[in-house]
Structures are given as structure tokens and as C-alpha cells.
């Protein structure tokens, strides 16, 4: 905090006393109280540079980010040379996710003020947040030439390497940042490092970081406010209690955000207004799954708003999503506050989060409570831990009532399966094994999950299957070049001849589905199952064998199998999983019966019946809104039979 000389006039002394009170509160970490004191000082002396800067800092620390921006702008107007005010303004713009504005502002800074470490650090973040990763790395290198032991810059440079698919370089940057000391950011970086190491199939290093994650989470109080990388916890851990705590710790960061003002709406006979918020309304798995739901929403009963804060990739999928929406609202670059205010202005009855704690999420919007009922759905396979999310939309398999204690939200169970599917997805076309690089006479075990989902325990089972089935080959997806050599090393250590491994390149959806049908059995991963990949395999007519754990992410494939009438392929232990694969491998007739059933399922099974699914979802949305309109608090809404179409 700034130090000022004690003033002489009575009015100035009163302002100074308030400032001193604010400084004392800030030293205790009581930023909300500090802000009140600094604002009291400003009411007495509204043009004081020091009071403005201190108010901006306290507002930023207490999550009053819009106020922080206002105070920093006022401080700069009074003193354009204030370095502190400049970087407080940048920090506020970044927190508001106004990334393009942040970058433009930093590039407008005069050359003689661009020499410091703080400037290059801020510029690196702005470049990173606008997708300019190579330039961001160069900016962070400028920081490190000035201070090589800047832990945050090593970490942030790792993020840019990660986005460039250079996972091993990212890991080294994360590790360096941790060694140098990242303070309250350490847990988040342990999560990022564990995830990056799993993506590279460097399992010894990943296991070390996963243990660090668990140890830190276990040692924190439930009310701590830390960044936790929830997606890493949800996908790498099979412990639902641990996942809930990690998500709760993350949600605590939003505790002091004030709700936006909502205008009450007496709906009466008017349609229910449903809003979906996402950054993924383009060629993305979420849109691939949701497109037909948007097209089939009953416009006589629902007024649907799609709020997009992600990129427009000009794809056919983007055009399809826009055409399906009654209201498509473009909000890319808008702050959380601005998005929340727009949603509140639209008087949305039910707002649905399609991101959870994934990249480009806007949980800060939901923390502002722009809608009276808020739910999370599809994008994040686990609990948000957030008190401002009322419901998690699942089904009796992924969110069974017996697991309710593992979720902060109330359960909203669809009748069959939570995952929507698009009947307009490409149907498999004829393709030969030779064209896909597969032997005609082999039993092909297909493991097309991303590399991070392959755990050592699962690979042990797969290698055992190759030993037990001499004519089998293992068909894996070559997601990125850095994972393959490490996975091949793990296979070799387990005694597998690498000639029995086939690598599949990444393809477009139509070709991918066509080649998937060439396999004999899809073998799933644990503790994070195949999700869209599993429904693609079932659509292609391929039997899927899975192992269901105790978490949402480990039960998804089981839910999909239930929805196509193949629950017997969902096992409850790795031993049973292995035995099921062996039984199918030895029984070509059984595999053919399953294939025939799946071909029929494309047109008849609930998993692929988009009309039925949409009515089921709408019935659930109606139950949520009706409960609120009756003055009742959110409660578990368990599955009921899907409405007839």
C-alpha cells in the first residue's frame, strides 16, 4: 500500500483515518472491509490518487472487478504515469476476460514504459488469452531475461507450450514454476502438470503429481480459496469425495461476487425461457451432440437463447447451430458482468452451463445469478461444487441417487441417458481393413480414447488381453507425437511386441466412424470413460466393454450401453472387464449379434432417438422451473418415464 503524509485539515484527517483503517484491514486480508474504508476516504477526498489506487486494489482482491476497473481508470486520469494504476487496470480487464481490449491497451502503452518485467508479463498473458501462443512465449522470455526466477512466467509459458501441443515442454515449465515457488497457485499447477504428464503417458511423473494434488486438497479446509484445476481431478481421480472437495475449493473463489439485479417475471402462460451458455457453438464435441436438440426444441413451450462467448469458426456446424436458435446472442469478448447483465435483461427462467470447469468457462457469470434457476449439463463430467448451480443434469447411471452426497447440486435425472446424440451424424461407409492398416485375420481391440485417459491399470489389462489372445492387435489413436513413444515404452516394458500395435491418425468425423466399424471390440478406459468416442463407436456398430467406477466420468459409457440395451457390457471391476472382453473375443457369433443390435439401434434405441431425448430434457427443464415458480427450493428430481413422442 502507498504511504502518504498525515494531512493537516480536519476533512483531510478524516479521509486519512479511513485510509489507515483500510490499510489495516488489507493487511489482515479483509479486502471487503478495506474497500469500504478506502471508498469512505474517497467520498471525503474523491480526487486523491493514493485512495483511488488503494480502492482499485481492494476492489480487485474482493472480486468487485468492475469497480476495480473504474477506480484504476480514474487513477490513471489523475496520474497517467502511475505504474500501479496501469497494471491494476490490466488486471481488472483480464479478470473481466476482456482479452482483446487488454491487448490493445498494452500495445498502446508508450515505448518508454514497456521496459519493466510487469509490462512483459501482462503482455504475455494478453497474447496467450487471445490465442497468440508463439508471441506469448516470446513475451514471457522477455520477463525471464529480466528475472529468471519468476515462477509465474515459467508457469504461464508452460500454458502456451501446452496449447501448442508441446506437452513435455509444458511439463518442464510447470515443474520449474513449482520448484521456484508458486504459493497459492501451486495446487492448480500440480493439476496442470499431472494432466500434461498423463497426456504424454509419462506415468511415473504423473503419479507423483496426482499424489501431490490429493495431499494438498486433503490438507485444506473446505472454505479455502484456491485454484484447483478441477478437470484434472475429475478425469484422473476415481474418488468422488476428493472430486467434490477440489471443485468446492475452486468455487470458493467466487464467494464475494455480487449477484446482478434481476427483474421478476410473472410467466403465466408465456413460454419458458431457457438459456444455454457456451464457448463451443462451433465444430466441437458439445455442438455435435447438442445440434439436433436445439433444432427439436418445442418452440410452442420454450423460448431458447443460445449465448455464445467462443469463436466463430465459420463451419457448417456453426451455421447449423445459429439456424437452430430462436435467439443466438454473440457475446465473444464480453465480460462476465456484461454477459450476466444481458441474461438478466432477457429474463431467462433457466440458465444452463455447457462448460463446467473446462477451458474458456464462464463460471463467473453463474456466480452472478442472472437466472433464478441454474443447471450444469454435458460439458463437465462431475460436480461444480458451486452453491450457485442448483442442478446437475444426469441420469440414473451417471448420477444415481445413492451418489447424491458426491454432488453439491441437486440431481436432475433424465429417464434413460443424459447424453444427447445427433441422428444426422455420418453413418459408417464401407472401408477395408487394409485401407486402415489393419490385418484381415486379427482380432482388433480398439482403444480410441485420448492418451490422458489411458491409466497404467488399464494398460496392464490390455497387455494381458494381448497375451491371452495371440491373434489380437491393439488399435490406438495417435493423438499427438509426444505420447506415442512413451506409450510404446510402457507396452514394451510389459512384454508387448510393438508389431501388435496399430496407430490410427486423427480423421474427420465421417471417416473416423467408418474406420471404427473395422474393429472387433472397443475397450474402454478408467477412471475416465469414453464419452462422445463411445457413442461414436456404438453408432458405428462396435461392441463397447467398459468398467464403471464411482464417479460421473467413470460411468458415462455404462449409461450409453444402458441406452442401447447392452448393460451387460458394463462391468463393475477390472477383473470382470477383462473377463467380458475375453468372452467376446472367443465368441464371434455374440459379437455379430451385438453388431446387428447396434445397427438396429441407430433408428430405434433411446440413445439415438433425438425426438424422444428432447422431450425428456424438456420435461426435466419444466420440472425445474415449476418447482421454482411454486416457491420451492431445488431438490432432487429423479427419473420418470420419458414422455411419448
Go through each PLM region and give its residues:
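Short hydrophobic beta-strand element within catalytic cores of glycosyltransferases
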Residues: 543-552
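Short acidic/histidine- and often glycine-rich active-site loop of Leloir-type glycosyltransferases
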Residues: 554-565, 570
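Short hydrophobic signal-anchor/transmembrane segments that target glycosyltransferases
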Residues: 293-300, 456-470
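Short Ser/Thr-rich beta->loop micro-motif in glycosyltransferases that lines
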Residues: 355, 524-530, 548
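Donor-sugar nucleotide-binding helix/loop cap in glycosyltransferases
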Residues: 523, 537
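Alpha-helical solenoid repeat scaffolds of the TPR/TPR-like class and their adjacent stem/linker regions
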Residues: 1-439, 450, 489-496, 508-519, ...
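Glycosyltransferase donor-sugar binding loop
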Residues: 307-313, 473-486
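Short alpha-helix at the nucleotide-sugar/activated-sugar donor binding site of glycosyltransferases
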Residues: 538-539, 562
Amino acid at each position: 500500500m502507498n504511504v502518504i503524509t498525515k494531512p493537516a485539515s480536519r476533512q483531510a484527517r478524516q479521509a486519512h483515518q479511513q485510509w489507515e483503517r483500510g490499510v489495516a484491514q488489507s493487511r489482515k486480508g479483509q479486502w471487503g472491509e478495506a474497500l469500504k474504508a478506502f471508498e469512505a476516504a474517497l467520498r471525503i477526498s474523491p480526487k486523491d490518487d493514493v485512495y483511488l489506487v488503494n480502492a482499485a486494489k481492494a476492489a480487485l482482491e474482493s472480486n468487485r472487478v468492475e469497480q476495480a476497473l473504474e477506480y484504476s481508470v480514474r487513477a490513471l486520469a489523475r496520474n497517467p504515469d502511475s505504474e500501479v494504476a496501469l497494471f491494476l487496470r490490466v488486471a481488472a480487464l483480464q479478470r473481466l476476460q476482456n482479452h482483446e481490449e487488454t491487448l490493445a491497451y498494452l500495445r498502446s502503452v508508450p515505448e518508454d514504459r514497456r521496459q519493466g518485467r510487469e509490462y512483459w508479463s501482462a503482455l504475455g498473458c494478453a497474447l496467450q488469452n487471445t490465442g497468440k501462443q508463439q508471441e506469448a512465449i516470446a513475451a514471457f522470455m522477455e520477463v525471464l531475461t529480466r528475472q529468471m526466477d519468476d515462477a509465474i512466467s515459467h508457469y504461464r509459458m508452460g500454458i502456451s507450450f501446452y496449447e501448442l501441443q508441446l506437452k513435455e515442454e509444458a511439463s518442464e515449465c510447470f515443474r520449474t514454476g513449482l520448484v521456484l515457488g508458486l504459493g497459492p497457485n501451486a495446487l492448480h499447477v500440480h493439476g496442470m502438470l499431472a494432466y500434461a504428464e498423463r497426456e504424454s503417458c509419462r506415468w511415473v511423473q504423473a503419479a507423483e503429481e496426482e499424489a501431490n494434488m490429493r495431499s494438498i486438497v486433503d490438507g485444506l479446509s473446505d472454505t479455502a480459496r484456491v485454484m484447483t484445476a478441477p478437470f484434472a481431478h475429475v478425469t484422473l481421480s476415481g474418488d468422488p469425495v476428493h472430486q467434490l472437495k477440489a471443485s468446492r475449493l475452486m468455487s470458493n473463489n467466487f464467494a464475494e461476487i455480487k449477484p446482478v439485479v434481476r427483474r421478476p417475471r410473472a410467466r403465466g402462460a408465456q413460454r419458458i425461457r431457457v438459456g444455454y451458455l457456451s464457448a463451443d457453438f462451433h465444430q466441437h464435441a458439445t455442438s455435435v451432440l447438442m445440434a439436433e436438440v436445439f433444432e427439436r426444441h418445442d418452440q410452442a413451450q420454450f423460448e431458447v437463447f443460445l449465448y455464445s462467448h467462443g469463436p466463430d469458426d465459420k463451419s457448417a456446424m456453426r451455421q447449423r447451430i445459429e439456424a437452430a436458435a430462436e435467439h443466438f446472442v454473440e457475446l465473444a469478448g464480453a465480460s462476465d458482468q456484461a454477459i450476466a447483465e444481458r441474461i438478466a435483461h432477457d429474463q431467462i427462467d433457466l440458465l444452463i452451463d455447457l462448460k463446467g470447469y473446462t477451458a474458456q468457462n464462464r463460471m463467473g457469470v453463474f456466480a452472478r445469478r442472472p437466472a433464478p434457476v441454474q443447471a450444469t449439463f454435458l460439458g463437465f463430467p462431475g460436480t461444480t461444487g458451486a452453491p450457485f448451480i442448483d442442478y446437475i443434469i444426469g441420469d440414473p447411471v451417471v448420477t444415481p441417487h445413492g451418489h447424491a452426497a458426491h454432488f453439491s447440486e441437486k440431481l436432475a435425472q433424465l429417464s434413460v441417458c443424459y447424453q444427447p446424440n445427433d441422428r444426422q451424424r455420418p453413418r459408417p461407409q464401407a472401408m477395408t481393413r487394409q485401407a486402415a492398416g489393419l490385418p484381415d485375420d486379427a482380432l482388433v481391440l480398439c482403444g480410441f480414447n485420448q492418451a490422458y485417459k489411458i491409466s497404467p491399470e488399464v494398460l496392464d489389462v490390455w497387455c494381458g488381453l494381448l497375451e491371452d489372445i495371440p491373434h489380437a492387435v491393439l488399435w490406438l489413436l495417435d493423438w499427438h507425437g509426444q505420447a506415442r513413444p512413451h506409450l510404446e515404452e510402457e507396452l514394451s516394458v510389459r512384454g508387448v511386441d510393438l508389431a501388435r500395435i496399430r496407430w490410427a491418425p486423427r480423421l474427420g468425423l465421417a471417416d473416423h466412424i467408418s474406420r471404427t466399424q473395422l474393429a472387433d471390440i472397443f475397450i474402454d478406459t478408467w477412471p475416465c470413460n469414453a464419452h462422445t468416442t463411445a457413442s461414436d463407436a456404438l453408432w458405428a456398430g462396435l461392441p463397447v466393454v467398459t468398467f464403471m467406477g464411482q464417479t460421473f466420468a467413470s460411468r458415462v459409457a455404462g449409461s450409453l450401453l444402458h441406452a442401447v440395451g447392452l448393460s451387460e457390457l458394463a462391468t463393475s471391476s477390472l477383473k470382470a472387464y477383462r473377463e467380458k472382453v475375453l468372452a467376446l473375443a472367443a465368441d464371434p457369433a455374440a459379437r455379430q449379434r451385438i453388431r446387428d443390435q447396434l445397427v438396429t439401434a441407430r433408428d430405434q434405441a433411446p440413445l439415438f432417438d433425438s425426438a424422444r431425448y428432447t422431450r425428456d430434457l424438456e420435461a426435466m427443464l419444466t420440472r425445474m422451473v415449476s418447482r421454482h415458480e411454486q416457491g420451492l427450493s431445488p431438490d432432487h428430481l429423479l427419473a420418470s418415464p420419458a414422455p411419448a413422442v
